[in-house]
Amino acid sequence: MRKWGSAGMVTVLLVLILTACTGGSTNGSNVVQLEFFQNKPEAKASFDELIAKFNKEHPNIRVSQVNPPDAETVLKTRVVKNAVPDIIGMGATDTYSLLAQSGIFLNLTNDPLLKKVNPQYVQMLNDVTGMQEVTGVPFALNASGIIYNKAIFEKLNLSVPKTWDELIATAQKAKDAGVIPFYFTYKDDWQSNLPFNDMGGSLVGIDFYKERRENKTTFQAAYQEVAKKQLELLNYGHSDNFGKGYSDGNRAFGNGQAAMYIQGSWAISEIRKVNPDIKLGFFPLPASNDESQTKLTAGVDTLLAISAQTEHPEEAKQFLSFLLEPENSQQYIDQQNLFSAVDGVQQKDDSVSGLLPYFEQGKIVDFVDHYIPSAVQLNPTVQAFLQNKDINGFLSTLDKEWDKVAARRAS
């Protein structure tokens, strides 16, 4: 696949990299100091535990975690300032793609570390970057779909829907019974993007973005069905879809105020803070009436990369190898309600048991927003569309913003 990146930005980054100062150091007692920079504030405590264990087992290496607010922006700033951390943990996003294309990460293509993880998730990284080289090791994955309240489903005699028509029929039955079918939380624009991700991956697919990069297709041509169905879902929300945010939704759903919640696996722990005894289930959003085509939206929540300029690549690899040990991977995904990229490590939480067959069968598709540059402003664009309901205007805006970003990156 042809790379789509800013020639200007990549060139500047390459020049900076060649003159970059490195983060790793060795103190007077010959202890190697490594900086681990990661972007998830909710994962800081989990990584602190693992780092403490690693440091104890490796007295000649000391890993220190850095986890700033707005981490991706901070990381890009640090690249410009020639201060790339030794080890980086981040999502497989457009930011990762740009940084990988610029050459700041160590090439791990033939490294034994990759043998510990499922190759399907390595391919996800290659798809995002458009590169054959592998510059990150998938560590943890998240998933998006529909969380449902098992007690409400049982009370209303509802079954898990397998097709789009069944999903709408299930929502209608809940509505007829006086139960909110879906608790939407569109006050937060990123929440409005969740159905777009789920349906875009299943109905359109990831190959669309390869073709869009090459100007072979458009959102206007490919995303009509996604847009129409996302509007249809709005008929089964509550009275204040755009007045409630993510935290409101977690509280409401935890208190049994809705049957279903289009959400990510990251919300499970938040819902349980409200109601530890709630019985939850999880299923992929069935975007079509062909059950065999239903895929689970799942992507690399955290990948592990090493600076190409670190003074201590072998010690950095030791830390990555440690994190990829099954025991440590299991500890992390259990605490974070995530899924592991490590072969043989499974999420055992009963609430997500319905998703495991999709992982096992490889019936997963990446989050489509991983392929959309942040400058396109997808989230507020989707949010505005759901309010004004102008399908053609919405898709036209996505195409125009995409083309603007492409032009800037090509200059």
Model-found features: residue ranges?
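Short, solvent-exposed loop/beta-turn-alpha elements that line the ligand-binding surface or hinge
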Residues: N107-Q120, Y186, L203-E225, K273-N275, ...
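Hinge/lid segment of periplasmic solute-binding proteins
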Residues: G91-S144, I168, A174-D176, P195-N197, ...
